[in-house]
From Swiss-Prot:
Binds ribosomal protein uS19. An accessory protein needed during the final step in the assembly of 30S ribosomal subunit, possibly for assembly of the head region. Essential for efficient processing of 16S rRNA. May be needed both before and after RbfA during the maturation of 16S rRNA. It has affinity for free ribosomal 30S subunits but not for 70S ribosomes. This is Ribosome maturation factor RimM. Signal peptide: none annotated. Keywords: Chaperone, Cytoplasm, Ribosome biogenesis, rRNA processing. InterPro entries: PRC-brl_dom, PRC_barrel-like_sf, RimM, RimM_N, RimM_N_sf, Transl_B-barrel_sf. One of its GO terms (molecular function) is ribosome binding. NCBIfam families: 16S_RimM. GO terms for cellular component: cytosol; ribosome. Disulfide bonds: none annotated.
Length: 184
């Protein structure tokens, strides 16, 4: 099964040529190039491949958050896509987006263990952006939950909490994160 990543949320139609307002969910607008294949589906469609409809990007104006798809050329057709999600395959995203040293795709971080001083605190189940800060939503390990700690807690993606991300070891080492868990 193809893994799909949410790129943005489609807003209202704009203009007479089928333009769509795009509320970007990605840190990589450079992926939205002419000729790139994307899919549109309801936002809850991650697991239902049959609900994805493929389109080709005609153009994207980042400054105006305007997306044009090749086969959508009227306001009426554009309105049919309002409030849907714009998705791209994980493979396509990784091919088009060049990461700098220390940058990661969200999809690579989900599932990693969160470790502090050789103690596993839990695993990342989701990443949320609140204001301008990314947060790891961490499901606490059962042995810590049994000690009365929270089942789920948030860790800001900041140097104060995140020491190192080791994809090859499938873990994120932290400092000060256990204090967040204890106070959750």
């Amino acid at each position: 099964m193809v893994s799909m990543l949410l790129v943005g949320r489609i807003g209202k139609s704009v203009g007479l040529n089928g333009g769509l307002r795009l509320h970007l969910e990605s840190d990589f607008p450079e992926c939205l190039k002419k000729g790139v294949k994307v899919s549109v589906a309801p936002l809850n469609a991650f697991s239902c491949v049959s609900s994805f409809k493929e389109y080709i990007i005609h153009s994207y104006e980042h400054a105006k958050n305007l997306l044009f798809l090749e086969t959508i050329q009227t306001p009426e057709k554009a309105k049919e896509l309002t409030n849907l999600g714009l998705f791209m395959s994980e493979a396509e995203s990784k091919k088009l987006c060049v990461l700098k040293e220390g940058e990661f795709f969200y999809c690579d971080l989900v599932g990693l263990s969160v470790v502090e001083e050789n103690e596993i605190l839990g695993k990342v189940i989701e990443i949320q952006r609140i204001s301008q800060t990314d947060y790891f939503l961490v499901e606490t390990t059962l042995n810590l939950v049994e000690k009365g700690l929270a089942k789920i807690f948030l860790i800001p993606y900041r140097d104060f909490y995140i020491q190192e991300i080791l994809l090859q070891d499938k873990k994120i080492t932290t400092h000060n994160a256990k204090t967040l868990l204890e106070n959750s």
